[in-house]
Regions:
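Cytosolic juxtamembrane N-terminal segments of multi-pass membrane proteins
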Residues: 1-35
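Membrane-interface amphipathic/juxtamembrane segments adjacent to transmembrane helices
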Residues: 6-12, 87-108, 112
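Transmembrane-cytosolic junction motif
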Residues: 31, 74-99
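Transmembrane alpha-helical segments and their cytosolic interface motifs
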Residues: 31-47
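Short hydrophobic alpha-helical membrane-anchoring segments
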Residues: 45, 49-57, 75-82
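Hydrophobic alpha-helical transmembrane segments
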Residues: 53-72
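Charged, low-complexity intrinsically disordered regions
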Residues: 101, 105-108, 117-161, 186-339
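Mixed-charge, low-complexity intrinsically disordered segments
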Residues: 162-188
Length: 339
């Protein structure tokens, strides 16, 4: 697969011109709006000066007008600043989507990206890790990729539960000597898992489910909130690799088959992935060779929302870091299914 060096060489030769042209188009929209806002603020100032001239003899009225216009001027300035700031973030986001798709195009000519699409809940539920009977599921940034006739997909996932909260509003009526209490009920979202779901196939077929759960029993918060919502089945398997046992708890109904699947080679590959990105990962190996990987606190959305300083120009370092993260996702398939 092409690497960062290849991409930066492509950037210097061709892509810089293509990206700059796209950024310039968005810049024009931003500066057009900026000019309108500046003109609007100048008009407020002119009206402000004219009113002072017209009502200058009446000091009380003048001071009142000055005060009101100062409030209006400050309010519109604040609103316009917020609008511009939001537009800058939106432009940064749009540019990042362009970069994301261009990097995918550079790495493969066969991919599908849909920003507001999630993996079908039925397919997600088939991996049998999180209990969707008691969890709410949301997703976005669905991406399907085909490299060297190997297909895989990934998307952002949010799994959460809700609990009812009560907010009290108290009012004391002195005339009747009565304390009125009003209860407002609302649902509070409690995130259980937020990260990336990655699904692929490996050549090494498995005869039963095998689950790798990150060893978090020293973390009371995770133990309390995550494990209650995991629905995996099987018995805990102790592998001969002590270091791997310290990182992951292995569950399966078939100890012999799980040991066959989790060979030293496969464990080394999983360790290699952990070195590339240290985020906690949950692995599900299915009977048909499908593998589901849940990467905690790693999302495409966070990558797309990262500020890219587009007004001064997108730097090579920024593009290189962006490429590394996308390349990592595409390399998961390459590493795990490496012969």
């Amino acid at each position: 697969m092409k690497n960062k060096k290849d991409f930066l060489l492509y950037y210097q030769k061709e892509y810089k011109m293509i990206l700059d042209r796209k950024v310039d188009e968005l810049k024009k929209e931003y500066y057009k709006k900026l000019k309108v806002i500046i003109l609007e603020q100048v008009m407020y100032f002119i009206v402000f000066v004219l009113l002072i001239i017209l009502f200058g003899d009446n000091s009380i009225l003048t001071l009142l007008l000055i005060f009101l216009l100062m409030i209006l001027f400050g309010f519109t300035l604040f609103i316009n600043y917020k609008l511009l700031d939001n537009q800058k973030k939106d432009i940064s986001y749009q540019i990042n989507i362009v970069i994301y798709q261009d990097i995918l195009s550079f790495l493969t000519n066969d991919y599908l990206y849909e920003e507001n699409t999630q993996l079908a809940i039925e397919d997600f539920n088939k991996m049998g890790l999180f209990n969707l009977d008691i969890l709410n599921y949301e997703g976005c940034n669905f991406t399907g990729v085909n490299i060297d006739n190997k297909r895989f997909l990934y998307c952002d996932v949010l799994l959460y539960t809700t609990r009812e909260k009560i907010l009290q509003d108290k009012y004391y009526d002195e005339s009747d000597d009565i304390l009125y209490i009003t209860n407002y009920h609302y649902d509070e979202e409690i995130p259980i898992f937020k990260g990336l779901y990655y699904e692929m196939n490996i050549s090494k077929k498995n005869k039963d489910y095998v689950y790798l759960i990150p060893n978090n029993f020293n973390d009371k918060f995770i133990n309390k909130n995550i494990y209650h919502y995991i629905s995996f089945k099987g018995n805990k398997i102790e592998l001969e690799n002590i270091a791997f046992n310290e990182k992951y708890q292995v569950y399966s109904f078939n100890e012999l088959k799980s040991r066959y699947l989790l060979s030293l080679t496969l464990m080394e590959k999983i360790n290699e992935l952990d070195k590339l990105v240290s985020n906690k990962k949950y692995y599900v190996f299915k009977k048909d060779g499908r593998v589901g990987i849940f990467i905690n606190d790693f999302t495409i959305d966070n990558l797309l929302k990262k500020e890219n300083n587009w007004q001064k120009g997108i730097s090579e370092k920024y593009l290189g870091d962006f490429f590394n993260k996308i390349s990592y996702l595409l390399r998961i398939n390459e590493i795990l299914d490496e012969k």
